[in-house]
Amino acid sequence: MMDVSDTYILPVVGYRVWVLREGKVFSYAVDNFWIPKRANVAQCGGYEHVKFWGPHKIQSGPKLIPHASYSAPLAECGCGFYAFRTLPYLMEWLEHREESNIVVGEVYLWGKIVDCQYGYRAQYAYPKRFYSNSYEYNYAYNNSTVALREFNVPVEPMPETVGQPEFVYEP
């Protein structure tokens, strides 16, 4: 795990979850919606701390340090677009969640990227692919599917073989 962020011109691919609400695609942990057909740009919210959930308990995340939005993400801060390095890591993270209307997928990350233990935090992000096992997402046309299709990326079935890695928490 690096303590510094690097700038990437070519995208890194990660895995993340979104929420479908009000006919839009929202971030899971932060109340902002993703804009179709253009890069989504990270900004620091200046919160005291973020919450992230391990497989068994809620833990405090990194402190957010207010700074200029153009410098997001800072390695010392908790801002940026989050993505897991692997789909199995994401699936384990989701294991204890019961929210409805979630969508799992791949995301392109580029610009300033902070390498974290299980994934990345990035300056820019855009969906690469949405996964769904649901007939509704794949074939029906309603507010949810229209919201996904506006991104002009594939909506595909979830890969059938997704191993479940064990998270290892560092004290």
Language-model regions, residue ranges each:
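Short, flexible, solvent-exposed loop/turn segments with mixed acidic/basic and small polar residues
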Residues: 67-73, 118
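Extended catalytic/binding region for NAD+/ADP-ribose chemistry, centered on the ART fold
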Residues: 72-94
